[in-house]
């Protein structure tokens, strides 16, 4: 290291008077010292103040320029040297060198800038101000078609530099996207897919950029899907495939790219992986099976890509996915159920699947997961059943297949996601199905659980769905027995609270259910309606200008129904409802105006 001190002293003198011969020798000594002990040599270089002199040596004409850039690249491998490089004013001359025609100068300059930018806000900022990114992208564009090893090496360095420049920095990534880096990199990948290092750089760059929403449109306008699938088919190593997966997952969130990936044959690749890995317990294989099946489900989230794979229920992909449901592999059961839930996003598909026995498969799957079951599988299978129950023609078929009995086995679940889907499935099944609604509504165990979940303040979804199912049981059954069961279980107060929901649809469902209670079974419910302050709430809803027309209408229908109770009617009189109702006679909505006239007559006659 004494040698190094001498070299640094000598370098100071020769750098000042630019003695080319001895300068080259000093630079060679420095490179040698850096190769032996980079960190220690870098510290000495920093302490010597030589960095400031390097700025003057970085000139396009000088023969030693590439070596100086090489030294900067080496010292910038150390985190503690990056800010000193910026402070020494090296960025601007380095960026100027990007205009050089000399390939070695370009290579070392790209390395130096890339290393200075690595994890360094100051480095990136300086390169940004000097306009380095655009010059590098222009180089990549012009070099793209060249396949000689030197050009490929240079492109690899430039890709690495752009990656270090923009990594985890949204604004710099957005800048690269606006400079058109994406089409350039996609083209690069297509031409140089045989070059492992360059391919890897492109994939890492895509992985970074694909997270940005603004990148998706640019990606969609290239043939990225085709290139990635082509590359994927060639890969045998787990790590390489994983790198491609990391790009595919964020890209596949875009519907246009989903379709492109399906058309490029990605699904066939994924199905093949599933087949290869399904029986393996090796950690890598289990991880790859999960990634492949998750990605498969993601592709089905796009309407067009989903329909393309469904192929009227005759598609080979759809058939393969069906075979996952009875499998013994939890990951495949989960992916299969989620895939069915996605296929069940339109009525035609739902009807076809129910007619072809999917319900029985899902019920069998749920039966396997009742005791200490897998929560994610329960959730996915219930999601699928809920979606399948939406078309009117499916409801009776699913009810006679015994879906409600299977679903009710999960009433004891303490997992909010499962509770939420269970409630949604039952609500869909009883829609306009009076007999089923009555049967469920008389099930005291179910109603008690609903009342309990109506108080699940920590889980708004479960709370909302419980309220909606309580209301639906009354609305679809119109049964006195159902109302009695709900009164006995303490459900009335929740329906009254539901009438104050911020969602009009829920308010309306509550008011219709309450009107049926008042019309069919007012006596037993009277006390609960009073203590829940129903009359005061109705007054507020009618007086509030923001209430939707249907809310005003159903509130007045309910007021009329409540007149059958002496105590509730007294509350109505005490609150001067006439004033509020008479104002509504001139309401712009005809139904509201008519109901206001009727209600006013009833109030006048009764008083």
UniProtKB/Swiss-Prot annotation:
Subcellular location(s) per record: Cytoplasm, Cytosol; Endoplasmic reticulum; Mitochondrion; Nucleus
Free-text description of this protein's post-translational modifications in UniProt: Serotonylated on Gln residues by TGM2 in response to hypoxia, leading to its inactivation.
GO biological process: angiotensin-activated signaling pathway involved in heart process; CAAX-box protein maturation; cardiac muscle hypertrophy; myosin filament assembly; negative regulation of endoplasmic reticulum calcium ion concentration; positive regulation of mitochondrial calcium ion concentration; protein localization to nucleus; regulation of ERK5 cascade
Residue span of region Prevents binding to prenylated RHOA: 122-170
Repeat region (ARM), residues: 89-131, 170-211, 347-390, 391-431, 479-519
Superkingdom of the organism of origin: Eukaryota
PROSITE patterns: ARM_REPEAT
Principal subcellular localization: cytoplasm
Any GO MF annotation of the entry: guanyl-nucleotide exchange factor activity
Modified residues (N6-acetyllysine): 230
InterPro entries: ARM-like, ARM-type_fold, Armadillo, RAP1GDS1
UniProtKB keywords: Acetylation, Cytoplasm, Endoplasmic reticulum, Guanine-nucleotide releasing factor, Mitochondrion, Nucleus, Repeat
Keyword Secreted assigned: no
Gene Ontology CC terms: cytosol; endoplasmic reticulum; extracellular space; mitochondrion; nucleus
Pfam family, one: Arm
Its job: Acts as a GEF (guanine nucleotide exchange factor) for the Rho family of small GTP-binding proteins (G proteins) that stimulates the dissociation of GDP to enable subsequent binding of GTP. Additionally, appears to chaperone the processing and/or trafficking of small GTPases containing a C-terminal polybasic region independently of GEF activity. Targets include RAP1A/RAP1B, RHOA, RHOB, RHOC, RAC1 and KRAS. Regulates mitochondrial dynamics by controlling RHOT function to promote mitochondrial fission during high calcium conditions.
Oligomeric and partner information: Interacts with RABL3. Interacts with RHOT1.
Protein name: Rap1 GTPase-GDP dissociation stimulator 1
Originating gene: Rap1gds1
């Amino acid at each position: 290291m004494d040698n190094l001190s001498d070299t640094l002293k000598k370098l100071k003198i020769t750098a000042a008077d630019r003695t080319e011969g001895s300068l080259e020798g000093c630079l060679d000594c420095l490179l040698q010292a850096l190769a032996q002990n980079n960190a220690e040599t870098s510290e000495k270089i920093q302490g010597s103040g030589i960095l400031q002199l390097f700025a003057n040596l970085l000139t396009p004409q000088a023969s030693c320029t590439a070596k100086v850039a090489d030294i900067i690249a080496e010292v910038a491998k150390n985190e503690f040297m990056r800010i000193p490089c910026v402070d020494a004013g090296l960025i601007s001359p380095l960026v100027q060198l990007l205009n050089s025609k000399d390939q070695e100068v370009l290579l070392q300059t790209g390395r130096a800038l890339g290393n200075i930018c690595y994890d360094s806000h100051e480095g990136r900022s300086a390169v940004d101000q000097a306009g380095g990114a655009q010059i590098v992208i222009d180089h990549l564009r012009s070099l793209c078609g060249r396949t000689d090893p030197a050009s490929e090496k240079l492109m690899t360095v430039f890709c690495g530099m752009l990656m270090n420049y923009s990594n985890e920095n949204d604004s710099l990534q957005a800048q690269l996207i606006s400079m058109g880096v994406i089409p350039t990199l996609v083209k690069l990948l297509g031409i140089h897919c045989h070059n492992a290092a360059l391919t890897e750089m492109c994939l890492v760059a895509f992985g970074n950029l694909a997270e940005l929403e603004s990148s998706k449109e640019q990606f969609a306008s290239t043939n990225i899907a085709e290139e990635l699938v082509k590359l994927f088919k060639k890969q045998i190593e787990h790590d390489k495939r994983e790198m491609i997966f990391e790009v595919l997952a964020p890209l596949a969130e875009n519907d246009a790219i989903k379709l492109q990936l399906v058309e490029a044959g990605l699904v066939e690749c994924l199905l093949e992986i599933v087949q290869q890995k399904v029986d393996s317990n090796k950690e890598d294989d289990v991880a790859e099976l999960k990634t492949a099946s998750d990605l498969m489900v993601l592709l089905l989230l796009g309407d067009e890509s989903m329909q393309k794979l469904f192929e009227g229920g005759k598609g080979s992909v759809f058939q393969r996915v069906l075979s996952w449901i009875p499998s013994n592999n939890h990951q495949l059961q989960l992916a299969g159920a989620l895939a069915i839930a996605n296929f069940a996003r339109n009525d035609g598909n739902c009807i076809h699947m129910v007619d072809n026995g999917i319900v029985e498969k899902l019920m069998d799957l749920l039966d396997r997961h009742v005791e200490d079951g897998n929560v994610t599988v329960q959730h996915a299978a219930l999601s699928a059943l809920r979606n399948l129950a939406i078309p009117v023609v499916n409801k009776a078929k699913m009810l006679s297949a015994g879906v409600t009995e299977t679903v009710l086995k999960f009433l004891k679940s303490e997992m909010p996601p499962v509770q939420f889907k269970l409630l949604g499935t039952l609500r869909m099944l009883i829609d306009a199905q009076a007999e089923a609604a009555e049967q469920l509504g008389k099930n005291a165990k179910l109603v008690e659980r609903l009342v309990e979940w109506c108080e699940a303040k920590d889980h708004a979804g479960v709370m909302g769905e419980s309220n909606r199912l309580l209301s639906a049981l009354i609305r679809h059954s119109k049964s006195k027995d159902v109302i009695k069961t709900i009164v006995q279980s303490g459900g009335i107060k929740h329906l009254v609270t539901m009438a104050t929901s911020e969602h009009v649809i829920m308010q309306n469902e509550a008011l219709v259910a309450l009107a049926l209670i008042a019309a069919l079974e007012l006596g037993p419910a009277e006390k609960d309606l009073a203590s829940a302050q129903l009359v005061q709430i109705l007054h507020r809803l009618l007086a509030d200008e923001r209430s939707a027309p249907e809310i005003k209408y159903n509130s007045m229908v309910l007021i009329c129904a409540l007149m059958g109770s002496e105590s509730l009617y007294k509350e109505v009189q005490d609150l001067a409802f006439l004033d509020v109702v008479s104002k509504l006679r001139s309401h712009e909505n005809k139904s509201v105006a008519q109901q206001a006239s009727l209600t006013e007559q009833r109030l006048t006659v009764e008083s």
